[in-house]
């Protein structure tokens, strides 16, 4: 279970771009739909708690899910799974960006990513809104 927690949150950390809010769509899919670790309502509650506690929302959410499933070891593993791989990618991308920042193709790529991030955030708002609203039909 600890390895699955690590790999799941590593996947969330590597394959999403943007803020922690952009990560929530994939997190919900992994935690609620694919692994059935939390119900939709529990996930919405976990997101709410993650927002009001100090720190980045996804780190808080990973810590919450890990704690719920496997206590302190689960919290550590889920959190490390989320932050270690993206930090490695960030170091590599930063080096590449410094070397290629004036390249017109790189500038166009960054402009192209923006609409995708907006779409991901809109998806999260809709899915969380459905479970957050009482008596939503």
Stretches with model-predicted labels:
Residues 60:
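Conserved beta-loop-alpha segment that forms the PLP phosphate-binding cup at the N-terminus of a helix
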Residues 1-50, 64-137:
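Multi-pass membrane proteins that catalyze or facilitate reactions on polyprenyl-/lipid-phosphate substrates
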């Amino acid at each position: 279970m600890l390895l699955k927690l690590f790999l799941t949150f590593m996947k969330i950390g590597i394959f999403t771009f943007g803020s922690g809010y952009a990560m929530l769509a994939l997190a919900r899919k992994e935690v609620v739909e694919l692994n059935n670790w939390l119900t939709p309502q529990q996930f919405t509650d976990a997101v709410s708690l993650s927002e009001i506690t100090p720190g980045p929302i996804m780190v808080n959410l990973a810590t919450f899910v890990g704690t719920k499933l496997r206590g302190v070891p689960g919290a550590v593993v889920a959190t490390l799974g989320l932050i270690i791989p993206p930090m490695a990618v960030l170091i590599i991308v930063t080096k590449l960006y410094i070397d290629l920042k004036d390249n017109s193709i790189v500038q166009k790529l960054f402009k192209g990513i923006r609409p995708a991030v907006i779409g991901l955030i809109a998806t999260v708002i809709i899915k969380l809104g459905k479970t957050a609203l009482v008596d939503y039909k």
